Regions:
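Preference for long, amphipathic alpha-helical scaffolds in soluble/luminal domains
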Residues: 1-318
Length: 318
């Protein structure tokens, strides 16, 4: 079995994206497999888990009743990934058809009933955290909701060095890779949907420059790797940064590759296994409804799909 056959012999969420990104399949064939995501496999399972209150696990960012005793979760402590925000974000990553009846009904329930734990604000109105707001912009664009107000807030929160930081409201003046990639994904989606303004485009470009001038994973001052964990690839991506996530961002933006990503691409190539696959390396800890791969250290259909389409973009555009 070839690597492509291995990916095609999978859940509709992987199959349709592999057909679109790695083959010459017809538009009709791709659309037919994509339509299955809402009715079969992972996508259908997630939709079925929405509660009668219109939320997943009874909450927006966190499940009902969950609290962190020492503040927000970090990269190692984990958090539940079963609430509304991570579930909708996973449905986006699965590429579920936002126009399907099942999805429209689910998103309408979120818009009507889900409110953030912070200040009891409506879900698609955003809240005060830049990472959360960036992801909510991406979700709003994908699922056809009005998120103009969140975009305006994010534009006003961009830091002098070009990025964003969730802790800027507590006085931090230095950008975070994590916050920046989440906001960039939202702004890029907003722009690709035709809603971008001169101001949002300029902000997006400044944010990209923040990553590019650091070669996606290095300190600007010394050239040292910022965090070795970012060299290990995760899926689902959740909120943390890693190099493959950044490469996927630039691929989706569809601009010609900037030479400053060359080192990141070489890292990606170095991780291909002798059988042609890439591994799942850094699963973010926390409760999930069900796994999407076989675990860290095992071949990952998701990371293989993502790596191959990055390399296809990089090789086809450079």
């Amino acid at each position: 079995m070839t690597v492509l056959d291995w990916m095609l012999d999978s859940d509709p969420a992987i199959r349709w994206q592999a057909l679109r990104d790695l083959t010459d399949a017809s538009t009709d064939d791709v659309a037919a497999d994509r339509a299955r995501v809402a009715t079969e496999g992972w996508g259908a399972r997630l939709l079925a888990l929405q509660g009668e209150d219109g939320q997943w696990a009874g909450g927006a960012c966190f499940p009902a009743g969950w609290s962190a005793s020492d503040g927000p979760p970090d990269e190692t402590s984990g958090q539940p990934w079963t609430s509304t925000l991570p579930t909708l974000h996973l449905l986006l990553e699965l590429g579920i058809d936002p126009g399907s009846e099942q999805v429209r009904r689910a998103v309408a329930q979120v818009a009507d009933h889900c409110r953030w734990e912070c200040d009891d604000l409506p879900f698609f109105g955003g809240e005060e955290d830049a990472c959360i707001n960036g992801r909510t912009v991406a979700l709003g664009v994908y699922f056809g909701q009005d998120i103009d107000g969140i975009v305006a807030r994010l534009l006003g929160e961009q830091l002098e060095d070009g990025g964003w930081n969730c802790y800027a409201r507590f006085g931090s003046g230095r950008s975070s890779y994590h916050s920046t990639i989440n906001v960039l994904e939202g702004l890029s989606a907003y722009e690709r949907a035709g809603a971008g303004s001169a101001e949002s485009i300029a902000a997006r470009r400044r944010g990209e420059e923040y990553l590019l001038e650091r070669n996606l994973f290095r300190r600007k001052s010394t050239g040292e790797v910022v965090n070795p964990d970012w060299l290990r690839f995760s899926f689902p991506t959740r909120w943390p940064y890693d190099v493959l996530r950044a490469l996927e961002y630039f691929r989706a933006a569809a601009d010609p590759p900037d030479k400053r990503i060359n080192g990141a691409v070489e890292l990606l190539r170095s991780k291909q296994q002798p059988d042609g696959t890439w591994l799942l390396e850094n699963t973010h800890p926390g409760d999930v409804y069900f796994p999407l791969d076989d675990g860290d250290g095992r071949p990952s259909r998701w990371n293989t799909l993502r790596a191959l389409r990055v390399l296809r973009w990089y090789g086809g555009s450079s």
